[in-house]
């Protein structure tokens, strides 16, 4: 997984943020996650090797903003430049993830039209409340590619009505990590997987999280490699 964080930092806005892994990691490093700043890796997709070729070659996927939210308010002053970088690499795929679905439309670039071919817009759906809040907004937006991430999955979600539209092409799912991690139940992930299968939507379960419940048993899993298996 290639991650591009053009800026760092965010504000907690919903239940999925309660035990945010970035707040945990930043706290260990003495960083205030609530302070949003532009990173030194802002131009990462455009970086080149000594021979002049791109450091990140054609065909790669970049997950954008995993230490922030691409649509966080403080980044409004930098986002147009980030859009220009994204547009300059039509040979790559950029996966933009947000909990701020309500801000997407007004933050799109002027030449967005019906979407950039190399951008997948994705919202977080940690529980039913947020799925019902964010997915209708996503479905109303113009975009060539749409998806959602049920992580941290902290409750069962029924999303068949959204998958049935045919607009959602990619779903990721996973549990919560680090201090205070809430349980992720196997049955919740299995249900979501079956819903995606019914509507032929790509589904990937990326990790169990620290606290995973299956068949009535609770497993505390601290090894990230074990989680992803």
Predicted regions and their residues:
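Acidic, His- and aromatic-enriched active-site or binding-groove loops in soluble protein domains
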Residues: 118, 122-126, 226-229
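Conserved Radical SAM active-site core
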Residues: 1-14, 18-119, 128-131, 157-168, ...
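A general structural detector for well-ordered alpha-helical segments in enzyme core domains, enriched
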Residues: 78-85, 134-137, 188-192
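Anion (oxyanion) recognition and catalysis
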Residues: 87-90, 142, 190, 197
């Amino acid at each position: 997984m290639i991650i591009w964080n053009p800026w760092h930092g965010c504000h907690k806005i919903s239940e999925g943020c309660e035990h945010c892994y970035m707040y945990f990691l930043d706290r260990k490093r003495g960083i205030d996650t609530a302070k949003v700043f532009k990173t030194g890796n802002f131009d990462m997709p455009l970086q080149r090797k000594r021979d002049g070729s791109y450091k990140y070659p054609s065909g790669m996927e970049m997950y954008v903003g995993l230490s922030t939210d691409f649509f966080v308010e403080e980044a409004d002053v930098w986002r147009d430049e980030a859009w220009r970088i994204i547009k300059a690499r039509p040979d790559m795929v950029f996966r933009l993830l947000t909990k701020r679905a309500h801000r997407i439309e007004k933050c799109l670039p002027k030449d967005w039209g019906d979407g950039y071919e190399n951008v997948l817009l994705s919202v977080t759906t940690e529980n039913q409340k947020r799925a019902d809040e964010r997915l209708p907004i996503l479905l109303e937006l113009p975009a060539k590619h749409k998806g959602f991430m049920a992580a941290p999955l902290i409750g069962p979600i029924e999303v068949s009505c959204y998958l049935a539209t045919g607009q959602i092409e990619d779903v990721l799912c996973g549990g919560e990590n680090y201090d205070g991690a809430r349980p992720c139940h196997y049955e919740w992930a299995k249900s979501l997987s079956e819903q995606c299968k019914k509507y032929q939507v790509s589904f990937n379960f990326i990790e169990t999280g620290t606290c995973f419940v299956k068949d009535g048993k609770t497993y505390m899993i601290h090894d990230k490699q074990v989680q992803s298996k």
